[in-house]
């Protein structure tokens, strides 16, 4: 079947203003094709590097159904297709085309596609890209025609007028010749129309496809941002047709796939170059939602609470009362004469539509200030009533018409309340209002808000003064009209609303709603509540709005959240499997589809709302895990006695079953009888295991420069901060207390490591110093100075046998041969002989030789000891030399190997540190700039302090700065609270570490799995940064055997219990054995005791589970209603933040190399055979002792003789008398006369 193209007019066709007609055009097949993971694009202009970014925008959801359209000459049904229908644009479009002959030429965007509205044309005419926005007379079948491989006609539109955008892009030559074979080109586009701009994103991929759209991941980059400014609701594709003549054009093979964008959340992964390398559609399935919740592509095994990325609003519901009358603002503002200010007048406005845009867009008003509400929000709000107060004052007095102001006007004429909600509008009327007007200049008391005093005097004294308004007076004294609009918030049905059009009421779907100005997001459902006649909203116990009255139908509607938040995802870990199970907390399985709005979920999510693997638990509904009655190791505790495990099909079940299984944990049958026989497993064999346990006992100490953090360099802020008293001091005091506690934790933990008990050194006793006589108890193997003096000491290298020899020998030399030791199969003796040993062995040798003749050789047996001890000593010398040689050889080889490994490790470490240094240096300046900027951008307003002070007066500026200070103080308080919580956790960990130091290191714990995994043998502590590392040596069961056991045995009416261990039966007899090792013993009175009788007492334990308390949440509505002020916040310049090098330093290769080097270094540890040091003390012979004693006696005698031969009268200060031998003849002495001094000449 041919497609005939006929020109309307030949001249128009030549001018490219004609159109073509297609005869007998079949309807598109509209097959559905999965988008897989295509269509991701850069949705903003911000550069990001090495970061995961969560963004909400309009994206093509992964695995969306794309509709397929063709340009096809002849298909299997003998039809030709030229599919170019008008398609819905929606919130954006994803467009992908597979072709080989450049069939797809462009698009037309618009609304009505006629000349009454503007449309946008973006087409490729084979030489240029044409972009136009005009009122077009579009062709019914817009197309290009190609004749004999060359462009012939452009039948897109007939004419165009009222063009507002005209642009020609690029000059090129498009290959228009038709091609055969597979599709070679895949072009993808995304179109978004936002704020008057049509943004176009594109990517190209070379393919070789016979049909279909390839599965994969694609990222589109921005190419155009066109300021069209038109309404786009639909679009249409422009394609080309081909012919070898100038008529009878036929289509060539091409296909395009379209899908609409949806507002959803994506997580984008950017590499160091700012390129998107991976993406996740957070609403695609439970695992994708979990990855977005924890913001990580890799998820470890466990159960995780998720955030809601599943349901987003689909429509907008706006409901205002059916009011058509316009509010009479013109009568208020255009009154002929305004009253005096003291006699101000009020007008009530109700039952009308208020178009406030006319007011705040007017350029005639000199003042338009709103309090408690933003002018731009008025169009969306409804009020019970609006009051308009009017009066006339001077231009300079307008400032007093505001909440909290003082002055003549505010005190004595017109006063606004501090919580005023409304707008003040003023404009100069110097030419209109002239003459005398009155105001009250004084009054005994000030007026209350909205109080009016019409009197002209007070106690006979006139209180009114006059304004003299003339155009010639200064501006400050000229007449100014003032209108104060007071808004009465909804406490009754709304009568004044903005001019916003209402929409249809949509129920049972997630929508954005606006009821009389109450905005929100939720699901609207029919309610059974009853309202009072004046009631518009309903509130729950937490004072949150949970129901509303529709202002048009007066129907009461419940408002529920769009999503059910109590959803947890169970995963075995993404490294093991992508399979998950979902737990809906506190929900019956029958209610799950309604609770999560399953009809709005993706198909991948919807399978987790119903299905065959549905398991109702006390914790909620578990879907996606197979419930089994068996029990396995609890990998993932879910709660409420439920556990999940992950197994492969080969180790658990037959092929085809789920990999995640869930089961109820049980300690036995609920109705089991006490003392009934039960089976237990008792270890019969063990293996040694070493477990490493790291326990934190301290954390990094921190302090905060409070003033700098809150105020930066702002003097005004610092002065205001002083009013907060000692907050900063208390804050740092708390941080200091945390630091002190960390030191205390460390001290207490490591104080548990006590040294071995040592005997105190007794150096002084009763005034006598024994340090040179008694041995030093701190060195128990050393002898004292006197002992070293009285004995000769010989030190030898010990290959491993000399110490045992010395202990055996003692002081008896005759035991020398008996104390010979075994070493590596040889009998050895130390190569050392004392004089006693030499004398003994010599005597035996001589005696043996002398008696050999007359004892017929039997006496030669006395030579054997001498020969044996010589052989043994030669063996001792030999093995010692061999050990020394082998050790030297190992030292040389391993030292050389260690040196090379150390050199390599230093090189690798240097490379890694170089990388770290580069990143640290690059980030330092950028981080400093960022901190400085952030220090002025925090809290209630997004503005720097200087800007606050410059645009607000002092009082309001201090209020705003006070909010900023309060926000930052709250942040600091939260930080300190987190530190205190962390310190409490550290404290608990330190206490446990101290307990393990006492029980595991200094003792042997009997608690199973407390000191390591298994039964404890010994533990070794090692200090670690901010903690301690325990190396627990344990023995764990390698083999177990099941035995029937009983807690007690009844015999003759008495119950016998084991003193230690358990009773077990081997099938025929009962024994008692240890619980941790099977060592059966006969039951006797020694290992049992008798207690009580055989009666069984069963106790019932209360199993009540209490629900957690729900704290009552205070309502912020009243507070927030006061602060919807008209304050514009300037953008804060954080441009320097892009200077941060947020790249992740990849030093994994260096770390792996270091690990390898460390392994090699460990292998190079020298396992030397230990050479001990053996010291032997040799006693002197008897004659030496005899000479030593005789020498001491001679020394004493000589000392006494010398004393007696001198002229001393005594020796040793009178301790011994020498009077008989020390007295001289008195006659030879000179006379001594008392009191006479003799002089010698």
UniProtKB/Swiss-Prot annotation:
It comes from Bat coronavirus Rp3/2004 (BtCoV/Rp3/2004). The gene is S. Residues 1-13 form the signal peptide. The lineage of its organism: Viruses, Riboviria, Orthornavirae, Pisuviricota, Pisoniviricetes. Residues 14-1181 are extracellular. The chain crosses the membrane at residues 1182-1202. GO terms for biological process: endocytosis involved in viral entry into host cell; fusion of virus membrane with host endosome membrane; fusion of virus membrane with host plasma membrane; receptor-mediated virion attachment to host cell. Residues 917-961, 1143-1171 form a coiled coil. It is found in: Virion membrane; Host endoplasmic reticulum-Golgi intermediate compartment membrane; Host cell membrane. This is Spike glycoprotein.
């Amino acid at each position: 079947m041919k497609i005939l193209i006929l020109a309307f007019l030949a001249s128009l066709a030549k001018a490219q203003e004609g159109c073509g007609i297609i005869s007998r055009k079949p309807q598109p097949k509209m097959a559905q094709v999965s988008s897989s993971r295509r269509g991701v694009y850069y949705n903003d202009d911000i550069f990001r590097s090495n970061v995961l970014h969560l963004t909400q925008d309009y994206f093509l959801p992964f695995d969306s159904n794309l509709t397929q359209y063709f340009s096809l000459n002849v298909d299997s049904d003998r039809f030709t297709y030229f599919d170019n229908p008008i398609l819905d644009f929606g919130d954006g479009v994803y467009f992908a085309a597979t072709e080989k002959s450049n069939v797809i030429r462009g698009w037309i965007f618009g609304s009505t596609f006629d000349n009454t509205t503007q449309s946008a044309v973006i087409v490729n005419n084979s030489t240029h890209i044409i972009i136009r926005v005009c009122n077009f007379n579009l062709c019914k079948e817009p197309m290009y025609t190609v004749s004999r491989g060359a462009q012939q006609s452009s039948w897109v539109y007939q004419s165009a007028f009222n063009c507002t955008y005209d642009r020609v892009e690029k000059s090129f030559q498009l290959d228009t010749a038709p091609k055969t074979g597979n599709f070679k080109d895949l072009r993808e586009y995304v179109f978004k129309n936002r704020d008057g701009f049509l943004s176009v994103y594109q990517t190209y991929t070379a393919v070789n496809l016979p049909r279909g759209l390839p599965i994969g991941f694609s990222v589109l980059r921005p190419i155009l941002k066109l300021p069209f400014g038109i309404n786009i609701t639909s679009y249409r594709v422009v394609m080309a047709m081909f012919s070898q003549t100038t008529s009878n054009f036929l289509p060539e093979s091409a296909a395009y796939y379209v899908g609409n964008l949806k507002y959803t959340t994506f997580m984008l992964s950017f590499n160091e170059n700012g390129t998107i390398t991976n993406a996740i559609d957070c609403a695609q399935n439970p695992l994708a939602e979990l990855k977005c919740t924890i913001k990580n592509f890799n998820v470890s095994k466990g159960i995780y609470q998720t955030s809601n990325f599943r349901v987003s609003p689909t429509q907008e519901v706006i409901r205002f009362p059916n009011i058509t009358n316009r509010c009479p603002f013109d009568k208020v503002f255009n009154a002929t004469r305004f009253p005096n200010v003291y006699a101000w007048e009020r007008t009530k406005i109700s039952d009308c539509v208020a178009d406030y845009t006319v007011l705040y867009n007017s350029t005639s008003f000199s003042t338009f200030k709103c309090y408690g509400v933003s002018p731009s929000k008025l169009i969306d709000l409804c009020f019970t009533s609006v009051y308009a107060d009017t009066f006339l004052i001077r231009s300079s007095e307008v400032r007093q018409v505001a909440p909290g102001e003082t002055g003549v006007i505010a005190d004595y004429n017109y006063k606004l309340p501090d919580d005023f909600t409304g707008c003040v509008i003023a404009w100069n009327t110097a030419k209109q209002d002239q003459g005398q007007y009155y105001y009250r200049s004084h009054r005994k008391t000030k007026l209350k808000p909205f109080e009016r005093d019409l009197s002209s005097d007070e106690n006979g004294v006139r209180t009114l003064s006059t304004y003299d308004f003339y155009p010639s007076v200064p501006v400050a004294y000229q007449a100014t009209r003032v209108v104060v609009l007071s808004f009465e918030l909804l406490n009754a049905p709304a009568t004044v609303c903005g001019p916003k059009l209402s929409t249809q009421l949509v129920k049972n779907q997630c929508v954005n709603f606006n009821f009389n100005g109450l905005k929100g997001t939720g699901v609207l459902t029919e309610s059974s509540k009853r309202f009072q006649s004046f009631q518009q909203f309903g509130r729950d116990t937490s004072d949150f709005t949970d129901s509303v009255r529709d202002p048009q139908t007066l129907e009461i509607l419940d408002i529920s959240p769009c999503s059910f938040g109590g959803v947890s995802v169970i995963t075995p870990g993404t490294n093991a499997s992508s399979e998950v199970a979902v737990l809906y907390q506190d929900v019956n399985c029958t209610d799950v589809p309604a609770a999560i709005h399953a009809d709005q979920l993706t198909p991948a999510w919807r399978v987790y709302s119903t299905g065959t693997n549905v398991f109702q638990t006390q914790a909620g509904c578990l879907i996606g895990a197979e419930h089994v009655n068996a029990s396995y190791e609890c990998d993932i505790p879910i709660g409420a006695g439920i556990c999940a495990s992950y197994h492969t099909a080969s180790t658990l079940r037959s092929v085809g079953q789920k990999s995640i299984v869930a089961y109820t944990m049980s300690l036995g049958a609920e109705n089991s009888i006490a003392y009934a026989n039960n089976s237990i497993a008792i270890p019969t064999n063990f293996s040694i295991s070493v477990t490493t346990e790291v326990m934190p006992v301290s954390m990094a100490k921190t302090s905060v420069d409070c003033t700098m953090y809150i105020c930066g360099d702002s003097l005004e802020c610092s002065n205001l901060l002083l009013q907060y008293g000692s907050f900063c001091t208390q804050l740092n005091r708390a941080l200091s207390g945390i630091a002190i506690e960390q030191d205390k934790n460390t001290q207490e933990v490591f104080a548990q490591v006590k040294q071995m008990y040592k005997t105190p050194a007794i150096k002084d006793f009763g005034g006598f110093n024994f340090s040179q006589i008694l041995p030093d108890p701190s060195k128990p193997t050393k002898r004292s100075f006197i002992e070293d003096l009285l004995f000769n000491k010989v030190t030898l290298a010990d290959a491993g046998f000399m110490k045992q020899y010395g202990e055996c020998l003692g002081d008896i030399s005759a035991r020398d041969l008996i104390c010979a030791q075994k070493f590596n199969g040889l009998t050895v003796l130390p190569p050392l002989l004392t004089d006693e040993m030499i004398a003994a062995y010599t005597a035996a040798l001589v005696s043996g030789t002398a008696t050999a003749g007359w004892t017929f050789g039997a006496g030669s047996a006395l030579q054997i000891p001498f020969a044996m001890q010589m052989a043994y000593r030669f063996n001792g010398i030999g093995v010692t030399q061999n050990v020394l040689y082998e050790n030297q050889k190992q030292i040389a080889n391993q030292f050389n190997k260690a040196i090379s490994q150390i050199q390599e490790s230093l090189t690798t470490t240097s490379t890694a540190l170089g990388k770290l240094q580069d990143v640290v240096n690059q980030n330092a300046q950028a981080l400093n700039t960022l901190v400085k900027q952030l220090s002025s951008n925090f809290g209630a307003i997004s503005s720097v302090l200087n800007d606050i002070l410059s645009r607000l007066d002092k009082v309001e500026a201090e209020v705003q700065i006070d909010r900023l200070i309060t926000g930052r103080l709250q942040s600091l308080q939260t930080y300190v609270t987190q530190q205190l919580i962390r310190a409490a956790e550290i404290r608990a960990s330190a206490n446990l570490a101290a307990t393990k130091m006492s029980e595991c290191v200094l003792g042997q714990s009997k608690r199973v799995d407390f000191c390591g995994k298994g039964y404890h043998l010994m533990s070794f502590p090692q200090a670690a940064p901010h903690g301690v590392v325990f190396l627990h040596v344990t023995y764990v069961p390698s083999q177990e055997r099941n035995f029937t056991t009983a807690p007690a045995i009844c015999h003759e009416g008495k119950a016998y219990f084991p003193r230690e261990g358990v009773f077990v039966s081997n099938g025929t007899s009962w024994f008692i054995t240890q619980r941790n090792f099977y060592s059966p013993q006969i039951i006797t009175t020694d290992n049992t005791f008798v207690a009580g009788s055989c009666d069984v007492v069963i106790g019932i334990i209360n199993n009540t589970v209490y629900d957690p308390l729900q704290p009552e949440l205070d309502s912020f509505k009243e507070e927030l209603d006061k602060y919807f002020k008209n304050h514009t916040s300037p953008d804060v310049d954080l441009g320097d933040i892009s200077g941060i090098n947020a790249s992740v330093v990849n030093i994994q290769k260096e770390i792996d190399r270091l690990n390898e080097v460390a392994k090699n270094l460990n292998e190079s540890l020298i396992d030397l055979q230990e050479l001990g040091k053996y010291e032997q003390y040799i006693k002197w012979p008897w004659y030496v002792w005899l000479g030593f004693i005789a020498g001491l006696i001679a020394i004493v005698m000589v000392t006494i003789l010398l004393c007696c031969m001198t002229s001393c009268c005594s020796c040793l200060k009178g301790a011994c008398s020498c009077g008989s031998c020390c007295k001289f003849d008195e006659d030879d002495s000179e006379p001594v006369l008392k009191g006479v001094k003799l002089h010698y000449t």
